[in-house]
Amino acid sequence: ENRNFRECFALQRAIRHNGANAEVWGLNHDNYSEEPDWQSYDLIINLENYDETGWVPSLSKVQTKKFLWSIDAHCRGIDVYTQTANEGNYDLILEATPEFLTENSIWFPNCYEDVLIKPLDIDPIHDVGFCGNVVNRGQILQTVAQNFNFKFDNFVIGDAMVEAVNSYKIHFNANISLDINYGNFETMGCETLLLTSYNKHYEKLGLKDGENCLVYSSIEELIEKGNMALGDKELRNRIAKNGYDIVKEKHTFKQRAKTVLDILNGIYDEQSI
């Protein structure tokens, strides 16, 4: 139910959308039994963030350009990614968390798959919802539930996730640690109003409090802004539409794939993010 939403297939579709070809290979894929001819590619992108069995082959002697996509350094720390990059002689780390940038990495923010995640023709029936994993959000989710008509969709994935987010007037989000998680972009990609915890890098991504999302820095602010948006449908819809427009323009897998191809072709502009 979540297969088509995985990063590997989302990036593959996006690369093809940008006019290049892409193949997916790895553990639990149908083609895993036959290792590719790595030298036959222009670029290899390693998306594995949790190689617990050591299945990823050593690419240290492969001369093809190699990128490592670091998505979860905010959870695991940067050392494991740096070690993988060094041992495999990777050319570049695509780093989702800007606090971990080095001279061998670029900021590669999270994004969303606009082919699968989009506004649906349904009326939102829940004032505030949360679709995702609890992790360390238990206490704040309890607070939200105590203050709003709240719908909790625990680990709902795939098409059901898209339907859930579309059913909320407001989608509550709490980033973990330094992360700007996928949920930010997925929510806005559904044209649902995002109410999210503060991150200092939002402005660089074009996410602006009160214009295309709502950002809180305290419980009091969370409740105040949630009630404000619920009490003003026109405001809520306007902010949600602005949010949809900004992520559709700047933060889809298609844009991230273009960045990868621009780097490969030597025409990357850091200001494009």
What feature does the model see in each segment?
Residues C213-I219, M228-K233:
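Conserved acidic donor-binding segment of nucleotide-sugar-dependent glycosyltransferases
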Residues D209, G226-N227:
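N-terminal soluble segments of membrane proteins
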Residues N265-I273:
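Generic C-terminal helix-cap and adjacent flexible tail
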Residues G231-L264:
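A charged, aromatic-enriched C-terminal amphipathic alpha-helix characteristic of glycosyltransferases
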Residues E1-D209, V215, K254, K258, ...:
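Nucleotide-sugar donor-binding catalytic core of glycosyltransferases
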Residues N175, G210, Y244, K248:
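Conserved short-loop catalytic and cofactor-binding motifs
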